[in-house]
Amino acid sequence: MIGKRGEAADFAADHPGSNLERVVRAAKVPVLVAARAFRPIASVMLAFDGGASAMKAVDHVASSPVFDGLRIEVAMAAPANREAQVQLEEAILRLRAAGRDARAELLDGSADSALIARIEQQDHDLLVMGAYGHSRIRRLIIGSVTTRMLIDSRRSVLLFR
């Protein structure tokens, strides 16, 4: 578990803490990035892109007793095509096979803005997602959905590599 921002949190609201990305990239276990305010967890949004780290997140949510009795929404921001639908259905089937109360939502728009809007709209308590799936160089040039989600979300985030 780590906080979202360090000692300069009030002065650097547009940046995650300086150690956060380094810790998450090096971690061999999931990392919980705690929100500033405590919020009991009843509803979880799993941000899904079909990648390896997102599949790790699905497997963890399916197998961990921590998620027993919680509502799980698997949300994917992607063009509405057959491939996206199949990937989303596969994730839902895995979760339901493990006894999870899971549903799927295919979202329009850019991943970060569509997912943040969905979290707020559905009032989810926890965001679960894969993290930093691309190289640091690509992140510098294009940006990172993970970083945007950490900055824009007011929820705790459970990250998987």
Regions found by a protein language model. Give the residues of each.
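Glycine/small-residue-rich hydrophobic helix-like segments
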Residues: 68-138
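A generic structural micro-environment signature
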Residues: 40, 54, 70-73, 113, ...
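Gly/Ser-rich helix-loop-strand patches that form or flank binding pockets
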Residues: 1-37, 119-161
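Short, flexible loop segments at the rims of nucleotide/cofactor-binding pockets, characterized by
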Residues: 9-12, 50, 104-106
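Short acidic/Ser/Thr-enriched loop-to-helix initiation segments
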Residues: 13-29, 34-99
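Amphipathic coiled-coil/heptad-repeat helices and related helical stalk/stem segments
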Residues: 16, 57, 111-112, 142
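Short, highly charged low-complexity linear segments
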Residues: 60-64, 104-105, 153
